[in-house]
Amino acid sequence: MLSAVFLAGQLLSRGVAAQSFPLDACKGFQPKNVTVECASYRGRKAVRVTSLPGADAAYNMQQSGTGGGIVLLPRSSFHNGTIDVDVAAMPRVHAPALARGFAGIAFRVPPDATRYDYVYIRPTNGRADDQERRNHSAQYASFPNNEWLKLRKESPGKYESYVDLVPGAWTHLRIEINGVRMRLYVNRASQPTLLVNDLKLGDCSGAVALWIGVGTEAYFAHLQLKPQGK
């Protein structure tokens, strides 16, 4: 399985139309501030990603707009195009009360992973009995200088939106990226849930990674990358 994952990354770098990372094997991944393991969830092989032991105790980091972690996909390379992935996420057992099951994708990650743009969902907000929480169901942010709290304070409502979500249910995410523009489609909807026209890191290239926030248990399956124009 490891060879298949590496082959996908190698072929993608040569410009092959669409490459698949099945996410059914755990070797070769590069986790940062999270744990990753193979799992079976609701009848599907997947990888399970959770925050490191003790990370929830530092939940104030998340509240101040930082925190979370990534799992870099080996030899992935991405500039413009589409990212498709299935994710199922929820707050983990004993997570802080304000945990929402934060999970999504980081893209254009440099080798040192010191900065990246990312987009994610908050599954427990999707059907909350509170309109403001519903409006915060999907989020774009950029690590480390434009995290969610900063963006919300400076541009309320611009980088997050509502989408119907169910905690723990498999949810399909499709992310379209072109230059400094990003579109997020959820569950194969014909119209995007979230539109961003000013990606904070600009028009760059890098790796792709699975992303979760603290207090999260998330499962990822069948990630595909398709370069623009292929």
Q: Where do the language-model regions lie?
A:
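Extracellular glycan-recognition regions
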Residues: A17-K230
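Boundary at the C-terminal end of the N-terminal hydrophobic targeting segment
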Residues: L7, S13, A17-A18
